């Protein structure tokens, strides 16, 4: 997974975990998606594992659009604590808010039941709770 090439500030404060997502709450590209039902952090290793599992399970049945990218650096303190500052960036993570669409599945050739099995398999690997959403006849979003 790629990391940000250049950022103005690499060492950030921790973000607020209380708020809900207001912008990315509906499916835009695909018929099926994975929606976060709680707020939390996704680290880069977790993102890579989730991507690998979904690609492995779905193979060539559809295109997958991942709606997350590691934006924030997680720092560790150095060995000498006194006056050393904040520390170097050790990992990258992204904040996933409750209600946001995290993954979309485009050009699906699978039924809703088969898709639900894949998402249930993938949900065990997530550090937050997620659920499947789908668009029914292009009119509205259905909770499954």
UniProtKB/Swiss-Prot annotation:
InterPro entries: Ribosomal_uL16, Ribosomal_uL16_bact-type, Ribosomal_uL16_CS, Ribosomal_uL16_dom, Ribosomal_uL16_sf. One of its GO terms (cellular component) is mitochondrial large ribosomal subunit. It is found in: Mitochondrion. Pfam families: Ribosomal_L16 (PF00252). Keywords: Mitochondrion, Ribonucleoprotein, Ribosomal protein. GO terms for molecular function: rRNA binding; structural constituent of ribosome. Transmembrane segments: none annotated. Disulfide bonds: none annotated. Its main location: mitochondrion. One of its GO terms (biological process) is mitochondrial translation. Belongs to the universal ribosomal protein uL16 family. This is Large ribosomal subunit protein uL16m. It comes from Dictyostelium discoideum. The gene is mrpl16.
